[in-house]
Structures are given as C-alpha cells and as structure tokens.
Amino acid sequence: MALARAEGNRHIHAMNNPRIDASRITIRRGEAADAAAIAVFGERTFLETFGPANDPAHIRAYLDDAFGLAQQSAELADPDTTILLATFDDMLVAYAQLRRGPLPECVAHADAIELQRFYLDRHAHGSGLASTLMDEVRATAAALGAAHIWLGVWENNPRAIAFYAKCGYDDVGSKTFDVGTDRQVDRVMVAPVAAADPSGRIR
C-alpha cells in the first residue's frame, strides 16, 4: 500500500507531541510504491533538523541529490538496501534504512551493516517510537546476517549522539559528510546487533 522521506545519511529526532501513540504504530518493509512518500518525508525532516544550522544553498543542493524521487526509487530497488517504514493511521511517521556497503576505517567489524537513515517525524518524539524502531532495526540487521550496526551522526548533534549512546552505540571515530559542497564531520558509532539489558549484559 502506498503511503498518504547514496552514502551514509544523518539521523534525526524531532520535537515532542503526544498525539502519536506508539502502540498503534505499524512497521513494514518499504516497497516501490512508497518512493514519493519517502522523498517528501525525508526532505522535510532533514530540512527541519539541519536547515537552521546550515547554509541554505548547501542544504538545497544536498536535498536535491539525496531525496529526489528517482533516488528514492533506486534505493528501494537496491538489493543491498533495506528500508523500514513506521506508519500511524497510514501516515509515514518514521523510517530507517539499512545498507550493506564499504566500511569506514574506524569500523573494525567486517560483519557490520550501516544504519544509513533513522528519521522521525517531529510529532513522534517522546512517543516511544524511536526505541521501537531501533528494536526493529536490530532484528532486521540480524535477519540480514549482520552482527554489528554502524552509523554516522553529525558531531554538532549532541541530542542524537546521546540517543544512540543510550541504545548501546559506542563512538569509534569519525568520517566526513558533504552537505552540498560543505564538508562536515560525523562521529561514527557502532553497536552489536544483540541489544543490552539495563545491567549491560548482551541479550
């Protein structure tokens, strides 16, 4: 059912709104018919999160390249890419994207898969959806044969860095990320696919 958002993309968390009920969220694999909804959602959430801190020309260049309909269609068709869509009353409210590809030098695990995107609607923060979606990311990564997950997160996004640390991701180094022609620095974080319980034991 169609929905009414290249190399590693940044991860987004949005503002609190109690209207999203995580118990009514459905998570499924993305399909070809979802390309337009993902393109619109991805551009909007990226712009809301990173637009205020970046030059508009750089942001526009990045959005045109990363979130065009053709690009989303290609990513949905890519056998190395798996997209998870979270819907609430048939509306797209979050999505995650896993991809097999080259690893940064600081990632020591050959079995790692990249969490390329992890985007939430600004009305979903505080609903518990981020944790639910991360659990599904781990399960999907395991089903794809990965034992570790890695991601890149902007060094100037402490809120997202804190979220990933809470989810068990460790900072292992850095890599560059181009927003238009503006070369920026991302922290690289890695976690085992198996989640840790509050005591720190892997389960």
Question: Where are the regions a protein language model picked out?
Answer:
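Short acidic/polar active-site loop segments enriched in Thr and Asp
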Residues: 147, 170
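Acetyl-CoA-dependent GNAT
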Residues: 17-21, 29-35, 40-125, 131-136, ...
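Short hydrophobic/aromatic beta-strand or adjacent loop that forms the aromatic wall/cage
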Residues: 81, 184-188
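Conserved beta-strand-loop-alpha-helix junction that forms the acyl-donor binding cleft
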Residues: 151-161, 178-183
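Conserved active-site tyrosine of GNAT-family acetyltransferases
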Residues: 164, 169
